[in-house]
Design a protein with these regions (language model features):
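Electropositive, glycine-dotted interaction segments
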Residues: 94-218
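Conserved P-loop NTP-binding catalytic core
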Residues: 43-113
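Generic marker of residues within folded, mature protein domains
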Residues: 10-12, 19, 76-78, 110-111, ...
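Short, flexible loop/turn elements at secondary-structure junctions
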Residues: 11-13, 26, 90-94, 125, ...
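Beta-strand secondary-structure signal
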Residues: 6-8, 19, 85-89, 118-122
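A general secondary-structure signal for short beta-strands and their flanking turns/coil
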Residues: 2, 15, 79-85, 114-118, ...
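Pre-Walker A-like glycine/lysine-rich segment at the N-terminus of P-loop NTPase domains
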Residues: 1-53, 57-74
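Generic hydrophobic, aliphatic-rich segments that mediate packing or membrane embedding
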Residues: 36, 44, 82-84, 117, ...
């Protein structure tokens, strides 16, 4: 059975550092309000679904850990700039298609000498891209526009959601108020369950049937 085995977070929202282990069948996150339950789920979405990939860089204000931002403000330098690092370790069947794409011995900044399946996400300041920003940084300003967001597998290969090794369905009922929950569930299930080719075929067939239905109405 394929599943998420563990999660490692650095500098993301509420957590300066956090490690979570998951079991194979069911996991329940319990805690008080603002304890970070949603942050854990958001971290998984960020990695597997490449959340924020096309978002405006200003969103980083809300993603950086406030303690790391405060540490930078207290001692502003390129070295102390806030960053985000997330690892999702996976339990995959080695015989599964593309499984080797996620398998690696040395991965991430932790450089663990262990062979595992997984994906990592990193958001950090690009010194080459931000050449000439040193003075601004020393004044305590975070150059959000010069940050890069990267997704790579533990095999150090670029990760794209189309190669997602397992289906991941995230239903956030707090953000579905503008649409019926059932429709929201169906839309999310459709996106998560089927590959791009199947989704494209279904959308084209639906569009053709819709056009045909309107044509049959005989409207002027």
């Amino acid at each position: 059975m394929n599943y998420i085995k563990s999660l490692h977070i650095e500098g993301f929202k509420k957590f300066t550092s956090l490690d979570v282990e998951f079991n194979e069948h069911m996991n329940i996150l319990v805690g008080e309000n603002e304890a970070g339950k949603s942050t854990i789920l958001d971290a998984i979405k960020t990695v597997l679904n490449q959340q924020y990939r096309n978002a405006d860089k200003s969103i980083l204000r809300d993603l950086f850990n406030t303690q790391m931002v405060a540490a930078f403000k207290a001692e502003p330098s390129i070295r102390t700039l806030p960053r985000i690092y997330i690892e999702v370790e996976l339990a995959l069947d080695p015989q599964q298609k593309n499984a080797s794409y996620f398998y690696g011995e040395i991965y991430g900044e932790r450089k663990q000498q262990v062979e595992k399946f997984g994906i990592r996400f990193e958001c950090k300041y690009d010194e080459e891209l931000g050449t000439g920003m040193e003075q601004s940084i020393q004044e305590g300003k975070i150059p959000y526009e010069y940050y890069t967001l990267t997704w790579t597998t533990f095999a150090n290969r670029p990760y794209q959601m189309i190669k997602r090794p397992l289906n991941f369905l995230a239903i956030d009922t707090t953000s579905s108020a503008s649409a019926p929950s059932f429709n929201y569930f169906n839309r999310t299930l459709f996106t998560s369950r089927y590959d791009d080719a199947t989704k494209a075929k279904a959308k084209n067939e639906f569009r053709d049937k819709l056009i045909e239905a309107f044509d049959n109405l005989g409207l002027p």
